[in-house]
Amino acid sequence: MLSPKRVKWRKQFVGRATGFAVRGANLDFGDYGLQAVEEGRLTARQLEAGRIAISRSVKRGGKIWCRVFPNIPVTKKPAETRMGSGKGNPELWVARVLPGKVLFEMNGVTREQAKEAFERAAHKLPFKTRFLVRE
């Protein structure tokens, strides 16, 4: 799973995802992309599942770029623990995704192959996405 090698602070505030993506909203590397339409949190497991779905769909052809990285720790207290006694331990890593953010990009495949691969990946993600093509 993807996670930062080291972080300055072990635990972070929850925070909220508001507004639209300004950076990372355009295709920079490939000819085809998968863009988020809704906001949400993307876990490292979901990101990896989407990447595997794309790579299995296109087999050995094409190049894939992953444009998001899970850099926010999510904490969780153990089951059946009384309230209080501080914040829980880091459980998983998530990426905060805003509407308009490009999640994956692909190059070296046909439009139909890219569309099918991104549809398979979209089923693994917790929010709505759309297919982008470079003009």
Swiss-Prot record:
Descriptive protein name: Large ribosomal subunit protein uL16
Keywords annotated in UniProt: Ribonucleoprotein, Ribosomal protein, RNA-binding, rRNA-binding, tRNA-binding
UniProt source species: Bdellovibrio bacteriovorus (strain ATCC 15356 / DSM 50701 / NCIMB 9529 / HD100)
Subunit structure as annotated in this protein's UniProt entry: Part of the 50S ribosomal subunit.
Pfam families documented for this protein: Ribosomal_L16
Keyword Ribonucleoprotein among record annotations: yes
Protein's gene: rplP
Assigned protein family: Belongs to the universal ribosomal protein uL16 family.
GO MF term set: rRNA binding; structural constituent of ribosome; tRNA binding
Biological role stated in the UniProt entry: Binds 23S rRNA and is also seen to make contacts with the A and possibly P site tRNAs.
Cellular component terms (Gene Ontology): cytosolic large ribosomal subunit
Coiled coil ranges: none
Any one of the GO BP annotations: translation
UniProt-listed PROSITE patterns: RIBOSOMAL_L16_2
KW Ribonucleoprotein (keyword) present: yes
